């Protein structure tokens, strides 16, 4: 083999070797915004933190603490829900809030009327009881009391009627108070959900917490 053939074979071999070597570009680091999955994971972490805060707080013995736990749960639910569901619940919650506030105002008026009824019944019951007690102490009042049979029956009837009204109005007032507490808790939950759903978040927890509205505050 002559030198020309050797040189030709060598050049062909080097060309094939260079052709099969892959080109690896240098790495570049681009600053990118958080992806949707990362943002969802962050919001789920915040939701879990809110639930932990609600569970680790003091046992909700009072109505205010129970409302606080309900608000924590509503905010955690808002952060956990996907965006379309969150917006749907937000619109429904805004409409429901109007009806709940109207129902709350109606129940408060009923409770005020019952308080007036309880006060009047209590005064009449106390007065009739005092008349009956004085008739036992004073002989002259007892004599007049026995001579006027209609007066005795009227006083006893008023006492019995007002006592019954007093007991019934007290039970109804207690039930209305329970409904008021439950409605206020529902309002706090929906207002907290709407507030959390209305916030825009870029990943900063401090910015997230600035827009939170709790209950009727």
Swiss-Prot record:
A Pfam family per the record: Orbi_NS3
Main function: May play a role in the release of virions from infected cells.
Stated family: Belongs to the orbivirus NS3 family.
The name this protein goes by in its record: Non-structural protein NS3
